[in-house]
Regions:
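Sec-dependent N-terminal signal peptides
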Residues: 3-13
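Boundary at the C-terminal end of the N-terminal hydrophobic targeting segment
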Residues: 15-17
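Catalytic-core environment of secreted peptidases
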Residues: 19-34, 39, 50, 54-62, ...
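Second-shell loop/turn segments in exported
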Residues: 32-42, 57, 69-72, 113-119, ...
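Noncatalytic luminal/extracellular "stalk/propeptide" segments of secretory-pathway proteins
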Residues: 35-141
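Soluble metallo-hydrolase cores and metallopeptidase-like ectodomains found primarily
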Residues: 110, 119-123, 171-252, 268, ...
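Metal-dependent peptidase/peptidase-like ectodomains
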Residues: 275, 285-385
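His/Asp/Glu-rich mid-to-C-terminal helical/loop segments that flank catalytic regions of hydrolases
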Residues: 384-415
Length: 415
């Protein structure tokens, strides 16, 4: 009896635990070897090969002859030198500053800073340009002065205009976030943390290169019993920002190694279930950070009839499910949202599941636009490491990844 009581006491605490494969996968996706899964050192290509291997190890099959669907796009990459100093003080890339992703290669030595006050029209900036010398001057703008949405629209347009003729420094509140661009401006733009900025001599060096990049979506399936009557599709983008210079890389744990790891965990659990008339498809997209390019290409070049999809679940940013989960399109697909909420109430995985309307903010978008019923699910929390080098695997709750995988399996099983 004592042994039985001990077993009953321990069981509730052993239902969920971090799966060693989940830990291994997210650590590898976020490793230096994969270089932030971007466009330097073949980072995204290495990640694609790795994900395909994980699918194969689970016994999943390719949708066609290969796990890969290739496509291409241009991107501005930063494969080499990157430095920025003020009065001889070398700043830390990714922490103290970032180089705007549309910046070109450049070597700067500027002694004269020109501070521009807040303005409400792009024309106000253009009028000041003839008085400045791009070989001597660098413009400084304080982002915190541009508060409203209209102000920010004007600021973005002005930066693009200024960079045609002059290097620019944007002062940022805290660590600036980084992005990816497909274009190059004439002059570089730097975003610098205000707390480390000072007036003085600016010296900087950037190596940037526009490349015609070959990328691959990774597509796998769990075959149905006989001809599939319908398909359930899980998606997650695996690409991230890569490297900003050779020495600074963005691991992208929450965005979106967490979603890829969760998707593979879901595949592992479904693979153990008896085969049914449903075919399960798992797609790891490339090119999301550049503008949803991988999912757009798939929808335009589908490997199966999109009308056969009963439901699609896109997983993007899943490191904070201890706070909540939000379903984009939750206010549109009421039946599925109610099913997800009720399933979570039974399983007690996350404190709250919120709904919101449609939004073109992740890889579900082109499927939804094509008439596919779909959710984009993301976790809550303040996401304080968004697009910064501190988005690391150690901060993702891997026990919650396993719990969310069980939630997803039960949810789609009820559709």
């Amino acid at each position: 009896m004592r042994k039985l009581l001990l077993f009953l006491f321990v069981l509730p605490f052993c239902v969920w635990a971090q799966h060693p494969d989940d830990v291994r996968i997210i650590n590898q996706l976020c490793s230096q070897e994969f270089s932030g899964r971007g466009y330097v050192n073949s980072g995204d290509s290495l990640a694609a090969e790795y994900i395909a291997l994980e699918f194969k190890k689970l016994g999943l099959r390719p949708q066609k002859r290969s796990f890969f669907q290739g496509f291409g796009f241009r991107v501005n990459a930063f494969p080499g030198k990157l430095s920025f100093s003020i009065n001889g003080n070398l700043l830390i890339p990714g922490k103290d500053y970032v180089v705007n992703p549309s910046s070109p290669s450049a070597k700067l030595d500027r002694e004269t800073m020109v501070f521009l006050d807040k303005f409400s029209r792009v024309e106000d900036v253009v009028e000041a340009l003839p008085q400045l010398d791009p070989a001597k001057h660098i413009i400084v703008l304080d982002k915190s002065k541009f508060i409203s949405r209209d102000d920010q629209i004007v600021l973005r347009a002005s930066i693009a205009k200024l960079s045609e003729v002059m290097p620019v420094i944007l002062l940022n509140e805290g660590t600036p976030i980084w992005h990816v661009s497909q274009n190059q401006w004439n002059f570089p733009v730097f975003e610098v943390d205000k707390t480390v900025f000072q007036e003085g001599v600016i010296k900087a060096e950037i190596e940037a290169k526009i490349i015609n990049h070959s990328a691959r979506n990774v597509v796998a399936r769990i075959k149905s019993k006989g001809k599939p009557r319908r398909r359930i599709v899980f998606t997650a983008h695996y690409d991230h920002l890569g490297r900003m210079g050779q020495n600074t890389f963005y691991p992208g744990a929450n965005d979106n190694a967490s979603g890829v790891t969760l998707m593979i965990a879901i595949a592992r659990k479904i693979r153990k279930l008896p085969r049914s008339s449903t075919e399960y498809v798992f797609i790891a997209f490339a090119g999301e950070e550049v503008g949803l390019l991988g999912s757009k290409f798939f929808v335009q070049n589908p490997m199966f009839d999109l009308k056969s999809i009963r439901f699609l679940v896109n997983l993007d940013i899943f490191g904070g499910a201890q706070h909540s989960i939000t379903a984009v399109n939750g206010t549109i697909y009421h039946e599925e949202f109610e099913c997800l909420v009720n399933t979570n109430k039974e399983m007690n995985v996350t404190p709250e599941i919120k709904s919101r309307g449609e939004s073109a903010n992740s890889d579900h978008h082109y499927f939804h636009a094509a008439g596919v019923r779909s959710f984009f699910l993301y976790s809550g929390g303040n996401n304080k490491h968004y697009h910064v080098p501190t988005d690391e695997a150690q901060d993702v709750d891997m026990i919650l990844v396993d719990k969310c995988a069980d939630l997803m399996v039960r949810f789609v099983g009820r559709l």
